[in-house]
């Protein structure tokens, strides 16, 4: 039997909500450590119709070649096992029972197997429930098949690392223990660490292959790993972040889907869930919109059964997948990454290579909230990537660029984040230097002197909220007052004596709106999840300085727009090549 999907019990990532693993509908359970399974109490009902443990018939039927499907369960005790099928017409309590079995497992017979092959003709999602009569022990379970894989897969996991050892080393240990030492995978999966910070020792690396690398960001690091895989005859590549944790089953599931895939140019994008809110989706695939993106299913609670149904059956077109978890066939790569350093490289890579990208529930990572990460440096990197990407790929009009840029500047200065506004302007200046800018400055080292004066501002530090005692302002402005706010540019066109000298609390977000800080001098941008923040201060001089600089630059950009667009489109395809990157790293195949 070939295992397609293992049962998970929330034993490895203890901070993750148990609702992603099982739904206790009656009674209770006792999770055991590591791979020891769970104990179900007497007269309990447990549903495994959860994010990690349901089986997507739609995914396996549509994208893979399976001739049969079986389910195995290991444990001890007496219980009723029921399988339920739910289709796109889901309503509460409308799941159809398709299998019901009385199961008794003892010391002599601790494995139960049932043939589910007839369900391969069905559409929908499959999950099971267990009703116990006495106390039961479930050691493990899996959906499996007798069908041999249709594709040979040698998967290289590429992790680009830079000063994140506290995340990286535990990830290496988990992959070593559960994958590289597993007879089923050790000859078909390799772990490559591209060490941009050059600080991983051989002892820390263990069985991973470490490539000491110049710091050319994620773009250069992932490309260096991809070149290694090409040179060592790997068939498939999986890009993963060094600071995102995941269930190893996400990697195994990715590997199995690639083995059984019957779809040309298939790529698998992992979902990102928040590490602090582990049931909330940050992004489950994305679509490109000129100078922005659409994060699919953002904000949905994946612990809810109706969300599982919606995200499984509602297949939106995915145009690119972020590199926190992105798997693809190496021979499908026609364009190598563009040297963005970070931000935008995954977007352009997905768009230019025209992968057939899917997301699968149960394949995910848990990452830091991007709202917390926002600041001058991320803003600089994001704006320059967005402008360059649009010049390379999009046919949108000049007015889209003008509108987006002015909006970014205004939102920053109206909310007292003048360093972010300056970072936005510097980004546009660098984009206007043309494609040669990107090949000359592969690293940020030579750029830091230009942007260093804005990096120290808006820095999140530890905050004693009780000592500062900021005011929580209730924002309820009628239409007339909103009109006044807009006409006075959030009070910047009013005399300074209108401004109140007090401290107002505002949640740290990527998008801040001026209404909540109208006529206030001091704003504490604060993240309650991390107990960090900074104070932004009303400054009319900086406001007008950044506004006029922004207007000056966008006029210059408009004058050069057609020429810039032509230069990027002519020269970028020559940069996104294997030849370019081998020259960068000065080695041949």
Model-inferred region functions:
Residues 298-325, 372:
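A recurrent flexible, glycine/aromatic-enriched loop bordering the glycosyltransferase active site
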Residues 204-220:
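Conserved donor nucleotide-binding strand/loop of the catalytic core
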Residues 1-125, 130, 385, 389-589:
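Terminal low-complexity segments of carbohydrate-biosynthetic enzymes
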Residues 320-325, 330, 334-351, 357-365, ...:
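Donor nucleotide-sugar recognition loop
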């Amino acid at each position: 039997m070939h295992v397609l999907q293992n049962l998970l019990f929330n034993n490895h990532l203890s901070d993750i909500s148990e609702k992603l693993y099982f739904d206790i509908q009656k009674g209770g359970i006792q999770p055991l450590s590591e791979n020891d399974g769970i104990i179900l109490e007497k007269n309990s009902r447990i549903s495994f119709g959860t994010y990690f443990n349901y089986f997507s018939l739609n995914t396996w039927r549509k994208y893979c070649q399976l001739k049969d499907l079986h389910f195995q369960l290991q444990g001890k005790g007496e219980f009723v096992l029921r399988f339920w099928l739910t289709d796109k017409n889901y309503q509460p309590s409308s799941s159809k029972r398709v299998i019901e079995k009385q199961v008794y497992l003892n010391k002599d017979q601790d494995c139960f197997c049932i043939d589910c092959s007839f369900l391969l003709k069905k559409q929908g999602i499959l999950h099971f429930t267990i009703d116990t009569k006495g106390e039961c022990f479930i050691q493990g379970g899996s959906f499996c098949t007798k069908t041999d894989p249709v594709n040979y897969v040698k998967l290289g996991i590429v992790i680009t690392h830079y000063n994140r050892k506290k995340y990286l080393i535990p990830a290496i240990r988990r992959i070593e223990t559960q994958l590289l030492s597993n007879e089923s995978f050790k000859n078909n999966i390799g772990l490559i660490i591209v060490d941009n910070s050059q600080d991983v020792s051989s002892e820390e690396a263990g069985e991973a292959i470490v490539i000491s690398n110049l710091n050319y960001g994620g773009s250069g690091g992932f490309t260096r790993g991809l070149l290694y895989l090409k040179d060592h005859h790997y068939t498939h590549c999986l890009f993963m972040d060094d600071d995102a944790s995941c269930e190893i089953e996400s990697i195994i599931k990715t590997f199995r889907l690639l083995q059984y895939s019957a779809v040309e140019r298939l790529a698998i994008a992992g979902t990102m869930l928040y590490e602090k809110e582990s049931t909330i989706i940050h992004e489950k695939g994305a679509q490109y919109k000129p100078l922005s993106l659409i994060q699919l299913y953002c904000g949905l609670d994946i612990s809810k059964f109706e969300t599982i149904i919606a995200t499984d059956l509602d297949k939106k077109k995915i145009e690119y997948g972020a590199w926190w978890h992105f798997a693809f066939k190496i021979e499908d790569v026609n364009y190598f990454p563009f040297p963005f350093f970070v931000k935008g490289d995954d977007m352009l890579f997905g768009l230019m290579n025209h992968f057939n990208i899917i997301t699968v529930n149960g394949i995910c990572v848990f990452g830091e909230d991007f709202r917390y990460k926002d600041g001058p440096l991320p803003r600089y990197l994001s704006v320059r990537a967005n402008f360059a990407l649009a010049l390379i790929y999009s046919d949108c009009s000049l007015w889209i660029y003008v509108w987006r840029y002015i909006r970014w500047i205004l939102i920053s200065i109206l909310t007292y984040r003048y360093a972010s506004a300056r970072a936005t302007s510097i980004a546009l200046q660098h984009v206007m230097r043309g494609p040669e800018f990107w090949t000359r400055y592969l690293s940020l080292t030579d750029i830091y002197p230009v942007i260093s004066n804005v990096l120290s501002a808006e820095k999140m530090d530890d905050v004693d909220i009780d000592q500062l005692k900021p005011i929580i302002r209730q924002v309820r402005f009628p239409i007339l007052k909103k009109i006044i706010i807009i006409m006075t540019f959030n009070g910047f066109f009013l005399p300074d004596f209108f401004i109140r000298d007090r401290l107002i609390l505002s949640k740290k977000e990527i998008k801040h709106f001026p209404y909540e800080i109208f006529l206030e001098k001091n704003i504490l941008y604060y993240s309650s999840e991390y107990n960090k923040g900074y104070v932004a201060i009303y400054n009319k001089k900086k406001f007008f300085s950044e506004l006029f600089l922004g207007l000056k630059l966008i006029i210059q950009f408009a004058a050069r727009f057609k020429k810039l667009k032509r230069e990027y489109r002519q020269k970028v395809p020559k940069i996104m090549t294997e030849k370019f990157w081998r020259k960068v790293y000065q080695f041949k195949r």
